Amino acid sequence: MFRNVQDILLLGRGFSYAVANETELKIMEASYTNAKAYSSCDYPHGPIATTKRFIPVIFFLTDEKTNDSTIKLVEKIKKDFSVSTLVVTNNEKYITMANEAVLLPKEAEGVAGVFGMAVFSQLFACLLSLARGYNPDEPIGLSKTTVTF
């Protein structure tokens, strides 16, 4: 589903949105694939217009306090745009919502979910890099330090 795509969307809310942002960076760094993270509560207010059938979407669902808006968005995007979807969740009831799913331990809820999603993100970026023929340990142009002006 992801090996030959040029773009990937990542959606989550709360802690999941923070992980989506980090996943965006890891995907771009390791596999040179354009990735963009959005908050699932902000996405319907503009960026949804850029949704394309050929751009797969990864949804992060590991916090029952914030999952509702993301669940509604999964349903809307699948219905209106017929995109390929992957759900990363700790709840079995959500795995059938998407084309593909990664089931984390049920204990990966809220703050604890960040750690499960982070492991997924690292492995996903690494495996995508390898599938595309790149070495994830030698990203082109990566600076390990930031410069402050």
For each of these PLM feature ranges, what is it?
Residues 1-149:
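A SIS-like phosphosugar-recognition module
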